[in-house]
């Protein structure tokens, strides 16, 4: 049994327009970066592969796939209660994440166009895909009588600065983990069509193909920059980003456990499989991957969630703030301790077998 939070009732900015979810460590974030540094990236070490992927992006294989067919044109009022709230929450967070990618890629494309046209073109194509996804998700929300004001989000969301190196690490992992999230839900729906309560799920196969291509681009970009994988500092950063992405994913899945249960997916099994597959896929890009077979690996990930669950309960309590401060210390310390122990698990060297991995 997974401890999970009850999905709150949606709040609105005005009739039919949902108020954005409160920003936390688990909500999708908006990013900016050093555009000059990206423009000056030397990609010659892997330019052939990058050009090949840009041509795939140009082909836009999914341009006709995201069409709202007749199946969407009906009332969805029969989706009620926690199932409806959890589905709206899933749509909102997914839409916000895709829109965040669109804004970052679009700005990258605009800022570097004159100095690095090949990368600018790639970012333009990926921005196209992210905008298509975000629009489709937002339209799905409108079927449930709500939608996001994306212009409001653009102007009012907090933007987090990441240097280009961090952007490459995190976006690569985000796209690849997104691929595995979507493809596993798609495969589950193929085997259990009785859980397919909304036609959006039929689009997940095409969706995951876009995520995979974006991940392939960032993998090629990463491998063109030896400083991102060919020294001890890079190895430490890779371990850090793999770990933080997997901890965040675990917390997010368990937080939304009611949504996954509503579509017949066991949250723990789903989370573990997504992490294992993403970790294995990352061997194609990174000099190392985490040892997910360690007997305490997933237990410690779940301890991070259990203590985050305690932090949420403390935050929502009506106790005085000074009492909450002291109550937060043990679970916050436990999260840090479990993450440290996970970080110290000996990783798996992938460069030693690079010829067989690629």
UniProtKB/Swiss-Prot annotation:
Catalysed reaction equations from the record:
Mg-protoporphyrin IX 13-monomethyl ester + 3 NADPH + 3 O2 + 2 H(+) = 3,8-divinyl protochlorophyllide a + 3 NADP(+) + 5 H2O
Q: What is its EC number?
A: 1.14.13.81
- What is an example of a GO molecular function annotated in this UniProt entry? iron ion binding
Q: Which GO terms describe its biological process?
A: light-independent chlorophyll biosynthetic process; photosynthesis
CDD domains assigned: ACSF
NCBIfam families this protein is in? AcsF, PRK13654.1
Family designation: Belongs to the AcsF family.
Listed name of the protein: Magnesium-protoporphyrin IX monomethyl ester [oxidative] cyclase 2
């Amino acid at each position: 049994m997974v401890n999970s939070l009850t999905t709150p009732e949606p709040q609105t900015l005005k009739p039919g327009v949902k108020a954005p979810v409160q920003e936390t460590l688990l909500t999708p974030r908006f990013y900016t970066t050093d555009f000059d540094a990206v423009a000056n990236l030397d990609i010659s070490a892997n330019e052939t592969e990058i050009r090949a992927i840009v041509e795939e992006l140009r082909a836009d294989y999914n341009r006709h796939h995201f069409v709202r067919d007749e199946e969407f044109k009906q009332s969805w009022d029969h989706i009620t209660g926690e199932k409806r709230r959890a589905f709206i929450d899933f749509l909102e967070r997914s839409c916000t994440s895709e829109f965040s990618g669109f804004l970052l890629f679009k700005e990258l494309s605009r800022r570097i166009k004159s100095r690095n046209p090949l990368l600018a073109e790639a970012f333009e194509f990926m921005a196209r895909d992210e905008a298509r996804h975000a629009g489709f998700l937002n339209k799905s929300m409108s079927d449930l009588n709500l939608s996001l004001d994306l212009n409001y989000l653009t102007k009012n969301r907090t933007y987090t600065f990441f240097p280009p190196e961090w952007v490459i690490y995190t976006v690569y992992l985000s796209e690849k983990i997104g691929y595995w999230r979507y493809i596993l839900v798609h495969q589950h729906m193929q085997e259990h069509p009785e859980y397919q309560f909304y036609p959006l799920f039929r689009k997940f196969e095409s969706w995951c193909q876009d995520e995979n291509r974006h991940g392939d681009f960032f993998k090629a970009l990463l491998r063109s920059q030896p400083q991102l994988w060919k020294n001890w500092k890079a190895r430490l950063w890779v371990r850090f980003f793999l770990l933080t992405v997997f901890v965040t994913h675990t917390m997010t899945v368990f937080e939304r456990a009611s949504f996954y249960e509503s579509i017949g997916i066991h949250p723990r099994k789903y989370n573990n499989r997504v992490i294992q597959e993403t970790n294995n896929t990352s061997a194609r890009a990174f000099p190392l991957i985490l040892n997910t077979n360690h007997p305490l690996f997933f237990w410690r990930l779940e301890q991070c969630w259990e203590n985050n669950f305690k932090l949420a309960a403390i935050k929502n309590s009506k106790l005085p703030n000074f009492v909450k401060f002291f109550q937060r210390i043990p679970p916050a310390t436990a999260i840090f301790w479990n993450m440290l122990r996970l970080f110290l698990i000996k990783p798996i060297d992938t460069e030693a077998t690079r010829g067989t991995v690629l």
